[in-house]
Amino acid sequence: MHVFWHQRDLRIPDNSGLAAATGEDTTLPVYIVDPELRERLGTRQWAFLLNGVRRLKERYRDRGSELLVREGDPADELGDLAAEYDADRVYYNRHYRPLGRKRQQRVDDTLSTEAVTDLVLVDPEALDPRYSSHSQFYTDWQAIEKSPPAAPSSDALTDVTDDTPVPEAEADIALPEAGYRAARARYDEFLESGIETYNDT
């Protein structure tokens, strides 16, 4: 069994790491509520993030699976879950910001992991860091093949039950609807009505 560790990627479709994990073995999806991240986010950001986790949990249940939600240090919590479910590897989508990289490094130092490129179309490490012009960067970027990940099969997701709730958080304003479906709807609306008037910068 594998564990897939959700972080910024609160979606099941179009998720390279999840597709890679489920393509190899039965996969247990997990989200860790990290107190260190909580300290760095504003109240509205935090509430919106947890709403997204809640929607993701619902989407997994729609597929007959479950998103396990735990709170604490990711390395500790993932280690406990890997031991409890006899998982041999933790998959995740690679981060590029300092806090995310630091958090992932702690997990790498503790567990057997597989980092997958997902948040960007091309992994920056695949490109020359010494470009003298944007046109050369663009040429190299275009030359790298990009294809959407396969959709994970519901049969590859673990059939477990877990009643641990997503923590509650209040915001002082009405927040937009969270989750993949709502985000996709906003994106489609922009393509239909907003892109023609969007300023080219």
Task: Give the residues covered by each predicted segment.
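Glycine/tryptophan-enriched, flexible segments
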Residues: 132, 136-201
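Trp/Phe/Arg-rich N-terminal binding region typifying the photolyase-homology
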Residues: 1-148
